[in-house]
A protein has these predicted regions:
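DNA major-groove recognition helix of helix-turn-helix/homeodomain DNA-binding modules
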Residues: 10-25, 31
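Short, conserved beta-strand element in jelly-roll/cupin
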Residues: 73-74, 84-101
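Short beta-strand His + acidic residue motifs that chelate non-heme Fe in jelly-roll/DSBH
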Residues: 82, 101-102, 108, 124-130
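Short acidic-glycine-tyrosine-enriched beta hairpin
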Residues: 105-120
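Helix-adjacent hinge/juxtasegments
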Residues: 25-57
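Recognition helix of helix-turn-helix/homeodomain-like DNA-binding domains
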Residues: 1-7
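A short glycine-rich, His/Asp/Glu-containing loop-to-beta-strand
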Residues: 45-82, 139-144
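Double-stranded beta-helix
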Residues: 129, 133-145
Length: 145
């Protein structure tokens, strides 16, 4: 403890045996805690949707993140269901197809290339009333999932 004694190899071997470690494990650097991912692969997206609506959350493992991004796919004739509300803001862009956004009692028909920006504290829903698939990319803050 005061750098005055150097343990014998036999003592070190006994300690390693007790702790179930190899010599290389004993002298290796401790593992760093998991860092949030910088690159997120498609296979790592978290599926949150159901009933013909796919909602894939981009999540990097950071529990303190303040922004959420979701890839949304609506099959023909599907909806998010009852109008929901949650704290925050949401913006999105229709990448393919068309969608009906219902908010504050009003329907908005959006097509590919159009975007929306809403206060998510107001009850809202999305419905694909068309015969084709609709794909949307959206961002939400603060994160609610």
């Amino acid at each position: 403890e005061q750098d005055k004694v150097s343990p014998a190899i036999s003592t070190l071997q006994k300690l390693l045996k007790v702790y179930g470690l190899s010599l290389s494990e004993f002298f290796s650097e401790p593992e760093k805690p998991d860092e949030p991912q910088v690159v997120i692969n498609q296979d790592d997206l978290i599926e949150m949707g159901s009933q013909g609506v796919s909602m894939k959350l981009v999540h990097n493992g950071n529990p303190n993140r303040t922004l959420a991004m979701i890839f949304e796919t609506y099959q023909p004739g599907t909806t998010t269901g009852e109008r929901i509300k949650h704290q925050g803001e949401e913006i999105g862009t229709v990448l393919e197809g068309e969608i009906v956004l219902t908010i504050n009692g009003q329907d908005y028909h959006l097509v590919a290339g159009q975007s929306y920006a809403i206060n998510t504290g107001i009850p809202h829903s999305f419905s694909n009333t068309s015969a084709g698939i609709c794909r949307i990319i959206s961002a939400h803050t603060p994160t609610t999932f």
